[in-house]
Design a protein with these regions (language model features):
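Catalytic donor-sugar/metal-binding loop of nucleotide-sugar-dependent glycosyltransferases
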Residues: 34, 43-62
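Long helical/loop segments within the catalytic core of UDP-sugar-dependent glycosyltransferases
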Residues: 1-36, 48, 69-111
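Short, hydrophobic alpha-helical packing/hinge segments within bilobed ligand-binding/sensory domains
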Residues: 42-43, 72
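Membrane-helix boundary/interface segments in integral membrane proteins
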Residues: 201-220
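Transmembrane beta-barrel architecture of outer-membrane proteins
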Residues: 38-40
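Membrane-embedded multi-pass helical conduit in multi-pass membrane proteins
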Residues: 112-204, 222-286
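Membrane-embedded helix bundles of polyisoprenyl
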Residues: 18-20, 60-63
Length: 286
């Protein structure tokens, strides 16, 4: 549905190798863009030169995605770093030549990874709040949740419910896309790293142009979860410290809920990276 929306706003984007170009169009922009986000950058240059793109919603071939944590997380890191670099340092001169609706579509792409940064900041905020003994905001927690949950549930219903009508393969794709949700949670640490390195202009070397897709479900991916383990330890320490200060202290009562969420979510997802879980998953899927 997002790509169809882009098409309707005259902003169909280039998608990696799944695109066809006019030779004249590429010559007009000086060739295919050289950048880690080369597809988005190329599309941006083409629209700035008033070329038009078309999205064809037909499945011509089925590809693969990484089937285990490591390549998935490194892919998120590489993609986010390149998108941040593109939109922070390079995109503005081209965006100024576009129509407002095209600018909106490209900014939707550019701002997407800030959702991951937001999740990462919300993960560390309760930890910091406990040690400085200050609530992150002045509000009544349960009153806030009673209002926020309504909006959050409505958002999920739109995403999971209404989104089912846009599937290209309904029999295979219908359902709750929980894996992508877990990937966003786990990948938030790597997206934040990609953001910081983009700000420091530390560009990535394209050592691997194609992310490995082979199934290594029985191989431990624990190495990629070291940041999550450290965040879990910090959350446990903050939880214990909040009780040590005063178990009834109002500033830390609500924060403990979020610390417990950190602990269970981060440790739970870390368990999925272990070798025995990979073997169990393969046995169950086989």
């Amino acid at each position: 549905p997002i790509k169809k929306g882009f098409q309707g706003n005259d902003a169909a984007v280039v998608n990696g190798s799944h695109s066809t170009f006019r030779i004249k169009a590429l010559q007009d922009i000086g060739g295919y863009a050289v950048h880690n986000a080369d597809d988005v950058f190329t599309a941006l240059k083409l629209y700035a030169r008033k070329w038009k793109g078309v999205y064809v919603p037909e499945v011509l071939a089925y590809g693969l995605t990484p089937s285990y944590w490591g390549p998935n997380l490194l892919q998120q890191y590489r993609w986010s770093n390149s998108i941040f670099d593109l939109f922070i340092f390079r995109a503005l001169p081209y965006l100024l030549r576009l129509k407002m609706r095209q600018i909106f579509c490209f900014m939707v792409m550019g701002l997407y990874y800030f959702l991951h940064i937001n999740f990462f900041l919300l993960t560390i905020l309760p930890i910091i709040s406990v040690f400085v003994n200050q609530p992150p905001v002045n509000l009544v927690l349960f009153e806030f949740l009673s209002r926020f949950l309504v909006i959050y549930v409505l958002q999920l219903l739109i995403l999971i419910g209404w989104g089912q009508k846009f599937l290209l393969r309904p029999k295979l794709e219908r359902g709750v896309w929980w894996r992508s949700g877990f990937l966003e949670i786990v990948g938030s640490v790597y997206v934040f790293e990609g953001f910081m390195k983009a700000l420091m202009r530390r560009h990535l070397l394209r050592i691997k142009f194609v992310t490995p897709k082979d199934n290594k479900g029985s191989v431990s991916q624990l190495y990629f979860f070291i940041p999550h383990i450290l965040l879990s330890v910090a959350s446990i320490t903050a939880f214990i410290y909040s009780i040590y200060i005063d178990i009834n202290l109002w500033q830390t009562k609500g924060i403990r809920i979020f610390l417990l969420m950190n602990i269970f979510i981060l440790l739970g997802l870390t368990i999925t990276s272990t070798r025995w879980f990979g073997r169990l998953f393969r046995r169950g899927s086989g």
